[in-house]
């Protein structure tokens, strides 16, 4: 049973959080209470909307989006989150701005933020650069606010970087909490974050890294599975190990999809490029070496093709707990015989869990909105209480 809005507000008010003083760039930088606050605020916003109560807390203001990579779900989730809160969206097209002519990050961050209350950034193409860029933007915003250039400090949200995809992993966690009933019920549950074959290369590391970095915070038994050579960023793996120790859960790495799926309660089969390949790709992209990139792609596709047996099939799902593990994916999945000839998951498995993955994705607008509210308001519980009391109809 999902909690009522009043119950969620009571829980939010009982938490110790400093999210109003910092940006949400990595989940493992936030305390357990701060993670719970985002989940609870998101759940309250979703419940208010379901009751036709407006969640518009801003009468004006901009939400800026900066997408340095393609996006469908996150782009529309961010736009939806801004709309939920009453903010208008403006996308920054860097190719059509003065950034293309050498304008500094410090200057751009201030120039776009005079009337901005939120900035969402996706920058996942270059290892070692995306999260660093977000922090540079954050520092520029801090300086602009401190110096009196900006009348308010915009909330900065990581819409995916080279290290983490916090809006995705938090939406995944919100869905798991809904599906299993509570965060407490996740303790001891086995989740298998596994590599899966894809006919494309260069998929970011941030989704699997986000999963192992977050689910290890809640006492879950997290298994990371991938073929030899498909490693993640070593520092993030260390974070997952330390998280598991602190939460009373476990974290282990295996090189067998079957072993990972065995008795799993949740499976998350998803392709990604090897860490070393992403490092090399970053160097080639920076050097604008098109021939080198073509050669690397050919090499990587051949490497992927050696592991077509890493495929989420009905037979593989039979290995899970009672053959009924929850299938998860950030979408779009590479569905064999549908979106590609051979991919991550069979049509049968995906179709069985298609609605579940859509419900998983449906949490993202509310998670993003919760991150923005938690940065802009020191007491989001009081704000939600006011919205509930006023009960302004969203649709008349």
Curated annotation (Swiss-Prot):
What Pfam families does the annotation carry? OTCace, OTCace_N
User: EC number(s) in its UniProt entry?
Assistant: 2.1.3.-
Q: What does this protein do?
A: Putative carbamoyltransferase. No activity can be detected with allantoin or 25 other related compounds, including 20 naturally occurring amino acids, N-acetyl-L-ornithine, N-succinyl-L-ornithine, L-ornithine, oxamate, beta-alanine and putrescine.
User: InterPro entries under this entry?
Assistant: Asp/Orn_carbamoyltranf_P-bd, Asp/Orn_carbamoylTrfase, Asp/Orn_carbamoylTrfase_sf, Asp_carbamoyltransf_Asp/Orn-bd, Carbamoyltransferase_YgeW
Q: What is known of its domains?
A: Contains a carbamoyl phosphate domain (CPD) and a second substrate domain (SSD), which are linked by two helices.
UniProt keyword terms in alphabetical order: Transferase
What is the recorded name of this protein? Putative carbamoyltransferase YgeW
Gene name as annotated = ygeW
